[in-house]
Amino acid sequence: MAKQPSDVSSECDREGRQLQPAERPPQLRPGAPTSLQTEPQGNPEGNHGGEGDSCPHGSPQGPLAPPASPGPFATRSPLFIFMRRSSLLSRSSSGYFSFDTDRSPAPMSCDKSTQTPSPPCQAFNHYLSAMASMRQAEPADMRPEIWIAQELRRIGDEFNAYYARRVFLNNYQAAEDHPRMVILRLLRYIVRLVWRMH
């Protein structure tokens, strides 16, 4: 006895997949590949009323048949909230469907898992190194220990030049005759250094 069209439509869903009365939609856990829902590719010109044919669309069914679009039970999946049918699904080279990622630009941070840093990461590293070099090359007034060392070196150089010139002009007699002058000159340089620090 031939089945009524209403019975045929109740056993076959909108996409052409045959449903048994006791069959329930598979519950997929989040993250499972959606290619587990294999569907037949519909043939709109199949026979619509044979006794042995319970689906209007005749197409090969089996685990190797490629799915044309996500099944009708994708709407019942919790993942459907975040996708719109087949518009966000793309097929990779392995044949599985996966979600497309958003096309936002790369973040300004380094990915430590890659060996070669990306161009934004290289620019960010260059910026950080430039800022570090500018911080190290501060003026002498900002770093008192360097300024004191420079002043002491300058005082020593001036003292050596003055002492050598004086000894040369006086034929080695000035240093021996006037040791107080040398000490006073050195004290004058130290007082000038302390005065500049305040």
Curated annotation (Swiss-Prot):
> Which keywords does the record carry?
Apoptosis, Membrane, Mitochondrion, Phosphoprotein, Ubl conjugation
One GO CC annotation = BIM-BCL-xl complex
Where does it mainly reside? membrane
UniProt topology in membrane: Peripheral membrane protein
| Record-listed Phosphoserine modification sites | S69, S77, S87, S94
Motif BH3 is found at: 148-162
Can you supply a Gene Ontology BP term from the record? cellular response to glucocorticoid stimulus
Q: What induces it?
A: By ER stress in a DDIT3/CHOP-dependent manner.
What Pfam families does its record include? Bclx_interact, Bim_N
> Which subcellular locations apply to this protein?
Endomembrane system
Give a yes or no for keyword Ubl conjugation in this entry: yes
Q: In which tissues is it expressed?
A: Isoform BimEL, isoform BimL and isoform BimS are the predominant isoforms and are widely expressed with tissue-specific variation. Isoform Bim-gamma is most abundantly expressed in small intestine and colon, and in lower levels in spleen, prostate, testis, heart, liver and kidney.
Entry keyword annotation includes Membrane:
yes
What ranges does the record give for the region Disordered, renumbered to this chain?
1-72
Residue ranges the record marks as coiled coil: none
Family matches, as InterPro entries = Apoptosis_Bim_N, Bcl-2-like_11, Bcl-x_interacting_BH3_dom, Immune_Signaling-Apoptosis_Reg
Q: Name one GO molecular function term.
A: protein kinase binding
Its PTM note reads:
Phosphorylation at Ser-69 by MAPK1/MAPK3 leads to interaction with TRIM2 and polyubiquitination, followed by proteasomal degradation. Deubiquitination catalyzed by USP27X stabilizes the protein.
Its domain description in UniProt is: The BH3 motif is required for interaction with Bcl-2 proteins and cytotoxicity.
> Family assignment?
Belongs to the Bcl-2 family.
- Job of this protein: Induces apoptosis and anoikis. Isoform BimL is more potent than isoform BimEL. Isoform Bim-alpha1, isoform Bim-alpha2 and isoform Bim-alpha3 induce apoptosis, although less potent than isoform BimEL, isoform BimL and isoform BimS. Isoform Bim-gamma induces apoptosis. Isoform Bim-alpha3 induces apoptosis possibly through a caspase-mediated pathway. Isoform BimAC and isoform BimABC lack the ability to induce apoptosis.
Q: How does it assemble?
A: Forms heterodimers with a number of antiapoptotic Bcl-2 proteins, including MCL1, BCL2, BCL2L1 isoform Bcl-X(L), BCL2A1/BFL-1, BHRF1, and BCL2L2/BCLW. Does not heterodimerize with proapoptotic proteins such as BAD, BOK or BAK. Identified in a complex containing BCL2L11, DYNLL1 and BCL2L1 isoform Bcl-X(L); BH3 integrity is required for BCL2L1-binding. Interacts with YWHAZ. When phosphorylated, interacts with TRIM2; this interaction is associated with ubiquitination and degradation. Interacts with MCL1; may sequester BCL2L11 to prevent its pro-apoptotic activity. Interacts with GIMAP5.
PANTHER family in alphabetical order: BCL-2-LIKE PROTEIN 11 (PTHR12044:SF9), BCL2 INTERACTING MEDIATOR OF CELL DEATH (PTHR12044)
What's the protein called, per UniProt?
Bcl-2-like protein 11
